[in-house]
Amino acid sequence: MTDTPPENEEQHESNVQNENEVEHLQQEIVTLKTELKEKNDKYLMALAESENSRKRLQKERQELMQYALENTLIDFLNPIESMEKALGFATQMSDDVKNWALGFNMILNQFKQIFEEKGIIEYSSIGQKFNPFLHEAVQTEETSEVPEGTILEEFAKGYKIGERPIRVAKVKVAKAPTPKENKE
């Protein structure tokens, strides 16, 4: 007879049941680890997305503030140039006018210093080659004294921040003389 005692059978069933439970728990651990990794990956992705959004919004805010500052400063360019022209005539006036002009020149220099501090620089165009990104041709003049496309005169100064123009210079540009026809 191969009957096993009831104690061994119970123990055997208990062992099988424990093994099944351990196996089930190990599978559950694997499943939970996988879920945890997925949730952690999603969290890290959301965190990175949030950080990128924060940086993008900060950059957009800085660009908007820079744009607003540029537009405000651009509005001062024409009055400043008018003041420069007026001060140019002051040298031909009386001593009293020259003293007033000296004070206005100091104010003008303060404006220019503010522009410089904000990165706005004026650029010279006379004698340069015409560049449509930096110049607006308002007149042309036929001449053979300089190469075609050379800027002869500047009617309004150009200004830029870094390499980006904020107001192009208005200029007169040289063009090649038109050939004259011989009439016989």
From Swiss-Prot:
UniProt family annotation: Belongs to the GrpE family.
One GO location term (cellular component): cytoplasm
Species in which this protein is naturally found: Chlamydia pneumoniae
Compartment(s) where it occurs, according to its Swiss-Prot or TrEMBL record: Cytoplasm
GO molecular-function terms, A-Z: adenyl-nucleotide exchange factor activity; protein homodimerization activity; protein-folding chaperone binding; unfolded protein binding
Phylogenetic placement of the source organism: Bacteria, Pseudomonadati, Chlamydiota, Chlamydiia, Chlamydiales
Composition bias type Acidic residues, residue spans: 1-10
Record's protein name: Protein GrpE
Disordered: annotated segments: 1-22
Residues passing through the membrane, by range: none
Function: Participates actively in the response to hyperosmotic and heat shock by preventing the aggregation of stress-denatured proteins, in association with DnaK and GrpE. It is the nucleotide exchange factor for DnaK and may function as a thermosensor. Unfolded proteins bind initially to DnaJ; upon interaction with the DnaJ-bound protein, DnaK hydrolyzes its bound ATP, resulting in the formation of a stable complex. GrpE releases ADP from DnaK; ATP binding to DnaK triggers the release of the substrate protein, thus completing the reaction cycle.
PANTHER family with a match to the protein in the record: GRPE PROTEIN (PTHR21237), GRPE PROTEIN HOMOLOG, MITOCHONDRIAL (PTHR21237:SF23)
Entry-linked PROSITE patterns: GRPE (PS01071)
Coiled coil segments of this chain: none
Superkingdom as given in the UniProt entry: Bacteria
Major localization class: cytoplasm
Keywords noted in UniProt: Chaperone, Cytoplasm, Stress response
HAMAP family listed in its UniProt record: GrpE
A biological-process GO annotation: protein folding
Pfam families linked to this entry: GrpE
